[in-house]
């Protein structure tokens, strides 16, 4: 074999090795910066306040045994005490008129809802409708200002291993972007009657509830709802698939509630 043939063989062998690597590298995003910059104005931070009523022990210094029926009986004789509590969450704008989607547990029993848009603009919001069973709520910002909405993607087309990004308000820090992949589909974790979660390893923490899970097209394919454990550091988060969420959201906007069919005698 002459030298030209040897060089040609080596070149062909190297080319065969490189081509699959180059093809695979196209699947890995070099940066999420452009996508995050486009989507962040549509993701909101939500803070709520509510009044909680507790009653003091009518017999200071005395503790009923665990499970004692007298504890509930005498609790009514205690002095009622009110205190203000607050909660944080996330959401995303789906209509230029200021319609926001979030989790029901973020706004449940809230007396005041404040939504922060694009980092510094704050608006009061009212609940259009909420559904505890699916843990979805829809809000209306009380303003005539126009906003940049995001759109829903087809969660049925999302595949295990696909890249995703989550944007939210972890620990009240404001717009925070994390990335990961879809780790599993059709997960049930015992939170509610209707469960079909997308599992992701994108970091989700307290305050991310109600925020969007985006695919690489910038479409919402999930609503971040739960984490496994007390914090999000273990890399297991769960999102309501967009196709399921859209059915509930459309009904909440139209009727203020969900209308489910029931079978019975």
Predicted ranges, named:
Residues 1-2, 16:
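A general, composition-driven signal for non-globular sequence regions
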Residues 2-11:
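Bacterial N-terminal signal peptides that target proteins for export
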Residues 11-12, 79:
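General helical structural elements
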Residues 12-22:
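Bacterial N-terminal signal peptides
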Residues 24-265:
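Serine-dependent protease modules
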């Amino acid at each position: 074999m002459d030298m030209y043939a040897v060089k040609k063989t080596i070149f062909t062998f190297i080319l065969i090795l490189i081509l699959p690597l180059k093809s695979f590298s196209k699947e890995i995003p070099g940066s999420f910066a452009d996508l995050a910059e486009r989507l962040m104005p549509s993701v909101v931070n939500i803070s709520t306040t509510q009044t909680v009523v507790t009653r003091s022990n009518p017999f200071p210094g005395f503790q009923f045994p665990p499970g004692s029926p007298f504890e509930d009986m005498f609790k009514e004789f205690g002095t009622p005490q009110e205190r203000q509590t607050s909660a944080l969450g996330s959401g995303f704008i789906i209509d230029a008129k200021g319609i926001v989607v979030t989790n029901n547990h973020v706004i449940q029993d809230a007396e005041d809802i404040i939504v922060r848009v694009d980092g510094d603009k704050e608006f009061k919001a009212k609940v259009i409708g909420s559904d505890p069973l699916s843990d979805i709520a829809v809000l209306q910002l009380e303003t005539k200002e126009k906003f940049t909405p995001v759109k829903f993607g087809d969660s049925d087309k999302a595949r295990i291993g696909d890249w995703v990004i989550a944007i939210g308000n972890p620990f009240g820090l404001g717009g925070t972007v994390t990335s990961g992949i879809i780790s599993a589909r059709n997960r049930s974790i015992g939170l509610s009657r209707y469960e079909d979660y997308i599992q992701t390893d994108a970091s989700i923490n307290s305050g991310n509830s109600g925020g969007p899970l985006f695919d690489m097209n910038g479409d919402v394919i999930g609503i971040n709802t739960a984490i496994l454990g007390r914090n999000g550091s273990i890399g297991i988060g769960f999102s309501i698939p967009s196709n399921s969420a859209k059915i509930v959201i459309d009904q909440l906007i139209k009727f203020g509630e969900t209308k489910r069919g029931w079978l019975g005698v």
